[in-house]
């Protein structure tokens, strides 16, 4: 339990928290959302760990290493080994120009990073997210994400 309040009302899901806690869990059955979950875990107080992440290595890119490198390049406290991700509390992310390995999920992670960064994040090849989520950028913008050039 990371300390989030999750509400489902009128067809909308909302998640809010004022004091996230770091947790440990297995990523074995949810590889496609682990990059974004890793970002959230960075903002939990304490040390976080996601185990059983080895499937991330055989996606469009090595998402295990890519996730850690991307978040770390923006100032996040995150590392990985052969099969796990480790985080510790990160107050905020900084700006950056990101090259994200030709992988649609890594671009979506970069977009999520932009929502908590203190400054602009530039992402290359934004069109590739259409592979799994054609309306991603429209939905991102409708939820308050700022977009230039999409």
Label every PLM stretch briefly.
Residues 1-150:
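Short, structured segments at the rim of ligand-binding sites
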